[in-house]
Design a protein with these regions (language model features):
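Conserved phosphate-handling catalytic cores of large alpha/beta enzymes
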Residues: 109, 118, 123-129, 139-211
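Beta-strand elements of well-folded, non-transmembrane domains
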Residues: 422-426, 474, 497-499
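Long, low-complexity segments enriched in small/aliphatic residues
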Residues: 425-469
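Flexible glycine-rich surface loops and low-complexity tracts that mediate binding to linear polymers
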Residues: 489-504
Length: 516
């Protein structure tokens, strides 16, 4: 890992720290944060309205992650509002895999549905759409994923491929919400309270699917966070989940939701039935249901920790490839992400399930997983994803071991971590500047800070952590280094600023004693 001081090249604002943070995120025009290209005016919105008005028995096919769950809930509440007979289907991760398939379509046929609407999936379901049509169903695809080149032969809504849409980096749930909003706008029957319930779900999904917090994304996430902090949240399911957060400081931020609420939602789709959370978001706000959802997440944590403790890495590998037996495939992405965070190397974690070897890969920005892996001459059973995350499966071990060997031939550039040299009045002043940029998340991140300082007032906590103080700019500031025992001396310190129940402190990311 290389560490370099970040220097701003453009002056966007007068405040030095604010200017550096904006430059760090490649934001050179404040309109990117303040401007909103919304509402959407889809090219084929009239066809959507006609199709919705035409059919009374409608099936929704959603995905099992947070985005798909929220998108399913949005479309379900919309169709119920119109008095439709609506039925939603979310596939099982292990049995069905991602997206639309013949098994899910058969459920819609058995339910006597005449129209299928996909949410957060379907843009690459060419054969599946044909299968549905051959059985007498019409199909509307709503998705935000990129097409492999060919589109399904049906009505499709995807902001990436609609010339009327100026900002397309939105999640699947927001695509669903924008269609619902467009329907009511064209009918001149907008119910603000009802739509607020839906946009809150789309905002939560925007955080979960790590969408850039620009344009309309920034607007809806900011409003969601504001509603939560002012106790004005409309969706009771979201309110109940927020109430279960182990949050000891105020206000709640988008990052808090990302780390505390989103994993709870995703856990049901990873280990059990994502429909639990759809039920929570669409009217079943029982204590028993949320207890079950929380319980599934606790199980997910325990299984993840157990599996992670058994992983043994070959440190000679350029790219880590692990094959674990008897692991729930819903944990693969979490495990590869945990290894990546610790090692900063691209990582794949695989397991054997249903006669297939399935895996999940994660990488930093320095190595494009999708581009590099798709260039390999390997017989994949399935492959898909994007720059930093991919899913792969093999039908036999020979192909897997060929992949494990040949993936080592890639050159992985050394990742670079940029920092801002700390030269500011106080942690309080810095925190106020950071707070002024909320919501913070994808597309608007805070770099690490750096100082070279003597440490003092050292306290060892639980025999493995070190609390200490640093004298900077005529005042002492409190720091903590987790899983590290320190002694007095001069140190190079990389840190991030955290708001804790005990006040602001620097959380150490990297620390090294300066040689005398």
């Amino acid at each position: 890992m290389n560490y370099l001081e970040f220097e701003a090249k453009n002056k966007i604002v007068n405040d030095d720290l604010l200017n550096k943070i904006l430059n760090y995120n490649n934001i050179y025009d404040l309109d990117l944060l303040n401007k909103t290209n919304y509402p959407y005016d889809y090219e084929n919105i009239d066809e959507f309205i006609k199709m919705i008005d035409k059919h009374n028995n409608i099936a929704i096919i959603g995905d099992y992650d947070c985005d798909g769950i929220c998108a399913t809930a949005i479309m379900y509440l919309f169709l119920k509002r119109l008095g439709k007979e609506v039925y939603y289907i979310i596939g099982n991760r292990t049995i069905d895999g991602y997206g639309m398939n013949s098994n899910l379509i058969n459920h819609a046929i058995e339910n006597k549905s005449k129209l299928i609407i996909t949410v957060d999936n379907g843009i690459n379901a060419i054969d599946e759409v044909e299968y549905a049509k051959s059985n007498g169903l019409e199909v509307i695809v709503t998705d935000h994923h990129l097409s492999s080149g060919e589109f399904p032969n049906c009505l499709c809504f995807n902001p990436h491929y609609d010339k009327n849409i100026k900002f397309s980096d939105v999640c699947g749930a927001f695509v669903a919400f924008s269609l619902v909003h467009s329907y009511f706008r064209h009918k001149n029957s907008v119910d603000k309270s009802f739509l607020t319930n839906l946009y809150e779900l789309s905002a939560l999904a925007t955080i979960a699917d790590v969408m850039p917090l620009y344009d309309i994304n920034r607007n809806i996430v900011a409003n969601l966070v504001k509603s939560i902090n002012y106790n004005k949240i409309t969706n009771k399911g979201i309110k109940m989940l927020v109430g279960r957060m182990n949050k000891t400081t105020n206000p709640i931020t988008a990052m808090d939701l990302s780390f505390s609420v989103v994993p709870i939602i995703n856990a049901s789709g990873r280990l059990d039935d994502a429909s639990f959370v759809v039920n929570l978001f669409t009217g079943n706000e029982s204590k028993e249901l949320i207890d079950e959802i929380i319980s599934i997440n606790e199980k997910r944590k325990n299984l993840t920790n157990e599996a992670f403790s058994n992983i043994r890495l070959d440190l000679s590998e350029n790219i880590y490839v692990c094959l674990l037996e008897n692991i729930n495939e819903g944990l693969l992405g979490i495990l590869s992400g945990k290894i990546l965070n610790q090692t900063k190397k691209p990582t794949f974690v695989f397991t054997t399930t249903n006669d297939l070897i399935k895996g999940s890969g994660r990488s930093l920005e320095n190595f494009d997983l999708h581009q590099n892996i798709s260039s390999m001459d390997i017989n994949f059973n399935s492959f898909g994803g994007h720059k930093r995350a991919v899913g792969i499966s093999f039908s036999n071990k020979e192909d897997f071991f060929k992949f494990k060997k040949e993936v080592q031939m890639f050159t992985v550039p050394e990742p670079v971590t940029y920092y801002i040299k700390y030269n500011y009045k106080s942690f309080n002043d810095v925190f106020k500047t950071i707070r002024s940029l909320e919501p913070i998340g994808e597309g608007l991140k805070i770099p690490y800070f750096y100082t070279c300082s003597e440490i003092s007032d050292i306290k060892i906590i639980n025999e493995k952590h070190t609390s200490f103080r640093v004298f900077m700019n005529n005042r002492f500031e409190r720091f903590i280094a987790y899983n590290t025992i320190l002694e007095s001396g001069l140190y190079n310190i990389l840190f991030e600023l955290k708001n804790t129940p005990y006040g602001l402190q620097g959380n150490v990311y990297k620390i090294a004693k300066v040689s005398e």
